[in-house]
Amino acid sequence: MRRSPRSGSAASSHNHTPNFYSENSNSSHSATSGDSNGRRSAGPELGEPEGRRARGSSCGEPALSPGMPGGDTWAGSSRPKLAPRSHNGQTACGAATVRGGASEPSGSSVVLEEQLNLLPILDLRQEMPTPRVSKSFLSLLFQVLSMVLSLAVDGLVCVCREICSIRFLFTAVSLLSIFLAALWWGLLYLIPPLENEPTEMLTLSQYHHRVHSQGQQLQQLQAELNKLHKEVSSVRAAHSERVAKLVFQRLNEDFVRKPDYALSSVGASIDLEKTSSDYEDQNTAYFWNRLSFWNYARPPSVILEPDVFPGNCWAFEGDKGQVVIRLPGHVQLSDITLQHPPPTVAHTGGASSAPRDFAVYGLQADDETEVFLGKFIFDVQKSEIQTFHLQNDPPSAFPKVKIQILSNWGHPRFTCLYRVRAHGVRTSEWADDNATGVTGGPH
């Protein structure tokens, strides 16, 4: 049971003491039990630390915790602490110890109550755990570090974005500059400058006058061009004629070096009764062809002339025909020579009308007996003059010789003979002349 406060003491100091320990449901007083004499029991006070179970015997000596090593520190504290003193400078041990069980000293009971009220507060401050303070400090430090790192990362990201945007802007500006420079150079060099064009505007009459003058200039240029074209054509024709004459002169040179008895100048002639008919063109241009340089309607006697040039030939119809040459006398024939211009000088660009396969016959005086002298092939690609040896063995003299053409080199309408030569030995010249009635010219 609680004691009534003494006279002169403050009652509020005992009635409103806070409860600092949640385990105790009692008041902040020390749990004391009064005996019959009104004394407190020496039992342990609730909330009192174990280090204060015993105190020193002498006054002013602080109570030590017997359970700690060394016995020189307070329980729950890392440094030595002294026992609280009273307001008048005396220690708490001036009276009897709290747990000693002795009678109260003669000191004031108010001082003892104040000391008892201060003990739980001092014990609570001494027993506050330090690990919770360190943990809260570390968590705060970690939070600060994480915030700093997040801010640094955000700053780096912003810097990278700025750099990328600047690089993109620089690239775009560079490409645009290159395009504009190329366009400018193209306008300068590809488009003609405008300074060369007239700046004044022409009237309609001036425009017509200029057009008329330019038309007259064009007509003059056209006339001069036609004149130059005619001159070039004439020069080309003269040059071609000169070249043709040189070629014909070269062709007319006698490379055979044998006497020719099929020459009109020595008395040879053509037996027209036994010779094929001439080629006649059925086109309306036949008349003009007879007047032109390229004449297809030459008589067969042209093959007895030494003039060999393109177009100066005897043409007969088809690829088969014959010609009978009357010799100036009886001649023991040994060779026959055919001559045809090469394809390189032909106006038609080829020699398809040249004879290919032919046969040679010797005719007797009665014109009925024919002696076969040989069959030959004229190769137009080989040479323009080709001599063929006859099969006249034993040699016989003939007043006439027949050349029978069996085929040509592909021309479908006609075949051309340019020149035929007959070589051999002439016998009984005067007798043959009297018999044939042919007067020979000078040899």
Curated annotation (Swiss-Prot):
<keyword id="KW-0175">Coiled coil</keyword>
<keyword id="KW-0966">Cell projection</keyword>
<dbReference type="GO" id="GO:0030154">
    <property type="term" value="P:cell differentiation"/>
</dbReference>
<dbReference type="GO" id="GO:0031514">
    <property type="term" value="C:motile cilium"/>
</dbReference>
<dbReference type="GO" id="GO:0005856">
    <property type="term" value="C:cytoskeleton"/>
</dbReference>
<keyword id="KW-0812">Transmembrane</keyword>
<feature type="transmembrane region" description="Helical">
    <location>
        <begin position="168"/>
        <end position="188"/>
    </location>
</feature>
<dbReference type="GO" id="GO:0005737">
    <property type="term" value="C:cytoplasm"/>
</dbReference>
<dbReference type="GO" id="GO:0005637">
    <property type="term" value="C:nuclear inner membrane"/>
</dbReference>
<keyword id="KW-0539">Nucleus</keyword>
<feature type="domain" description="SUN">
    <location>
        <begin position="267"/>
        <end position="427"/>
    </location>
</feature>
<feature type="region of interest" description="Disordered">
    <location>
        <begin position="1"/>
        <end position="107"/>
    </location>
</feature>
<comment type="function">
    <text>Involved in spermatogenesis. Required for sperm head formation but not required to establish and maintain general polarity of the sperm head. Required for anchoring and organization of the manchette. Required for targeting of SUN3 and probably SYNE1 through a probable SUN1:SYNE3 LINC complex to the nuclear envelope and involved in accurate posterior sperm head localization of the complex. May anchor SUN3 the nuclear envelope. Involved in maintenance of the nuclear envelope integrity. May assist the organization and assembly of outer dense fibers (ODFs), a specific structure of the sperm tail.</text>
</comment>
<keyword id="KW-1133">Transmembrane helix</keyword>
<keyword id="KW-0221">Differentiation</keyword>
<feature type="coiled-coil region">
    <location>
        <begin position="203"/>
        <end position="244"/>
    </location>
</feature>
<keyword id="KW-0472">Membrane</keyword>
<dbReference type="InterPro" id="IPR045119">
    <property type="entry name" value="SUN1-5"/>
</dbReference>
<dbReference type="GO" id="GO:0007283">
    <property type="term" value="P:spermatogenesis"/>
</dbReference>
<keyword id="KW-0206">Cytoskeleton</keyword>
<keyword id="KW-0969">Cilium</keyword>
<keyword id="KW-0963">Cytoplasm</keyword>
<dbReference type="Pfam" id="PF07738">
    <property type="entry name" value="Sad1_UNC"/>
</dbReference>
<keyword id="KW-0744">Spermatogenesis</keyword>
<feature type="transmembrane region" description="Helical">
    <location>
        <begin position="137"/>
        <end position="157"/>
    </location>
</feature>
<feature type="compositionally biased region" description="Low complexity">
    <location>
        <begin position="1"/>
        <end position="36"/>
    </location>
</feature>
<dbReference type="InterPro" id="IPR012919">
    <property type="entry name" value="SUN_dom"/>
</dbReference>
<keyword id="KW-0282">Flagellum</keyword>
<protein>
    <recommendedName>
        <fullName>Sperm-associated antigen 4 protein</fullName>
    </recommendedName>
</protein>
<comment type="subunit">
    <text>Self-associates. Interacts with ODF1. May associate with microtubules. Interacts with SUN3 and SYNE1; suggesting the formation of a spermatogenesis-specific LINC complex; a SUN domain-based heterotrimer of SPAG4 and SUN3 may associate with SYNE1. Interacts with SEPT12 and LMNB1; during spermatogenesis.</text>
</comment>
